[in-house]
């Protein structure tokens, strides 16, 4: 009998073990679809980004015009740009849902997979930030100025780091050029990290909604989950194309239709919606260094999740108190996102401060306490 090429060829063997014959828990729900959705998001962003880069000029005098030229004169340039800009939003929606799934079902107990995932998130945030600067509109310019300027809060070396990052004494041509270079490079770093992420995942196998060992009941990835993923792709591309075709500027800032002008500050500088929760946490602390530390902590706190897991059960499936806390955290993140988009005025300041405090309290204090309480309740 001839050997099966799929199982004997060095390259096909790897693909086979990762995507075809991979033993998968039979009960994983739609919450396990987001990994593959993130993969397809990355592929789409790299493809549309490559096509956009072919028509883009990384120069302060030409950047804004080159983007306008792409939208007006390049065949389907408007569509490629709209898919790329809104694709970023869908990327972040998927990433936040993916992290939420990980927190809810205790997937963070696969420490290596979880830690590489956080590195992926940080790289993704950096990529999105430098990419937002490229169209060189007002919000691009001022967003770049405000966020890079935060590094000056680092004692002693801060100002030097900022001027080094800028390539001068303000955000200017060198900044735009290096941001373009980074925006081109980082997605490939994300792709590389994704492979590491998957390597660690396949070392342990997938978690499942019950959080129990599922070795006795696994099914091949193909055709069951390959088909399920294909359905997921369709359900994501439908709203993405709808948004890109019918309301492409819904999530953007109108300020970015004005070319960058260092002499005119926009009335309200704010990042894209997917960074607003962190921006709200940054603004909630009146001290610059304190704000920067809180901003960093808002994402880096995820590294502590495996250490703060005190429950005897892995998932929250059978833990109603932790569930209540989890959904309170989700609601709190929505409040932070909303506050981040509002001006720094009376009700919003205190709401932002309370929401920021709640965010850290739930993650650092209430989750472990509730877990311990639920452990006690198991004895009765």
From Swiss-Prot:
GO terms for molecular function: metal ion binding; ubiquinol-cytochrome-c reductase activity. Its cofactor is heme b. The gene is MT-CYB. Heme b b562 binds at residues 84, 183. A ubiquinone binds at residue 202. Component of the ubiquinol-cytochrome c reductase complex (complex III or cytochrome b-c1 complex) that is part of the mitochondrial respiratory chain. The b-c1 complex mediates electron transfer from ubiquinol to cytochrome c. Contributes to the generation of a proton gradient across the mitochondrial membrane that is then used for ATP synthesis. Heme 1 (or BL or b562) is low-potential and absorbs at about 562 nm, and heme 2 (or BH or b566) is high-potential and absorbs at about 566 nm. The cytochrome bc1 complex contains 11 subunits: 3 respiratory subunits (MT-CYB, CYC1 and UQCRFS1), 2 core proteins (UQCRC1 and UQCRC2) and 6 low-molecular weight proteins (UQCRH/QCR6, UQCRB/QCR7, UQCRQ/QCR8, UQCR10/QCR9, UQCR11/QCR10 and a cleavage product of UQCRFS1). This cytochrome bc1 complex then forms a dimer. PROSITE patterns: CYTB_CTER, CYTB_NTER. Heme b b566 binds at residues 98, 197. The chain crosses the membrane at residues 34-54, 78-99, 114-134, 179-199, 227-247, 289-309, 321-341, 348-368. Belongs to the cytochrome b family. One of its GO terms (biological process) is mitochondrial electron transport, ubiquinol to cytochrome c. This is Cytochrome b. InterPro entries: Cyt_b/b6_C (IPR005798), Cyt_b/b6_C_sf (IPR036150), Cyt_b/b6_N (IPR005797), Cytb/b6-like_sf (IPR027387), Cytochrome_b (IPR030689), Cytochrome_b_C_euk/bac (IPR048260), Cytochrome_b_N_euk/bac (IPR048259), Di-haem_cyt_TM (IPR016174). Its main location: mitochondrion. Keywords: Electron transport, Heme, Iron, Membrane, Metal-binding, Mitochondrion, Mitochondrion inner membrane, Respiratory chain, Transmembrane, Transmembrane helix, Transport, Ubiquinone. It is found in: Mitochondrion inner membrane. It is a multi-pass membrane protein. Binds 2 heme b groups non-covalently. One of its GO terms (cellular component) is mitochondrial inner membrane.
């Amino acid at each position: 009998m001839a050997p099966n090429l799929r199982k004997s060829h060095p390259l096909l063997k790897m693909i086979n073990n990762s995507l075809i014959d991979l033993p998968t828990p039979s009960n994983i729900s739609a919450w396990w679809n987001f990994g593959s959705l993130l993969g397809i998001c990355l592929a789409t962003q790299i493809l549309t980004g490559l096509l956009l880069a072919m028509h883009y000029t990384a120069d302060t005098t030409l950047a804004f015009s080159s983007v306008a030229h792409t939208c007006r004169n390049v065949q389907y340039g408007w569509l490629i740009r709209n898919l790329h800009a809104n694709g970023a939003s869908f990327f972040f929606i998927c990433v936040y849902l993916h992290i939420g799934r990980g927190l809810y079902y205790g997937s963070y107990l696969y420490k290596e997979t979880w830690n590489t995932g956080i590195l992926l998130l940080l790289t993704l945030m950096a990529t999105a930030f430098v990419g937002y600067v490229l169209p060189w509109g007002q919000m691009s310019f001022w967003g770049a100025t405000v966020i890079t300027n935060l590094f000056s809060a680092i004692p002693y070396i801060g100002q030097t780091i900022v001027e080094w990052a800028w390539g001068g004494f303000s955000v200017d041509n060198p900044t735009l050029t290096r941001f373009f270079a980074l925006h081109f490079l980082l997605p490939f770093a994300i792709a590389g990290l994704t492979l590491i992420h998957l390597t660690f995942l396949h070392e342990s196998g997938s978690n499942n909604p019950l959080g129990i060992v599922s070795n006795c009941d696994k099914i091949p990835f193909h055709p069951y989950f390959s088909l399920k993923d294909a359905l997921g792709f369709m359900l994501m591309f439908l709203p993405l194309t709808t948004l890109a075709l019918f309301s492409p500027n819904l999530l953007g800032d109108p300020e970015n239709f004005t070319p960058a002008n260092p002499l005119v500050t926009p009335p309200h500088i704010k990042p894209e919606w997917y960074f607003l929760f962190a921006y709200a946490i940054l603004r909630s602390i009146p001290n610059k260094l304190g704000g920067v530390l809180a901003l960093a902590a808002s994402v880096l706190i995820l590294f502590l999740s495996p250490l703060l897991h005190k429950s005897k059960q892995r998932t929250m499936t059978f833990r109603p108190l932790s569930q209540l806390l989890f959904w309170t955290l989700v609601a709190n993140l929505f409040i932070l996102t909303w506050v981040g988009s509002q001006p720094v005025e009376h009700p919003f300041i205190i709401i932002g401060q309370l929401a920021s405090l709640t965010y850290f309290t739930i993650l650092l204090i209430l989750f472990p306490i509730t877990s311990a309480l639920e452990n006690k309740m198991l004895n009765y």
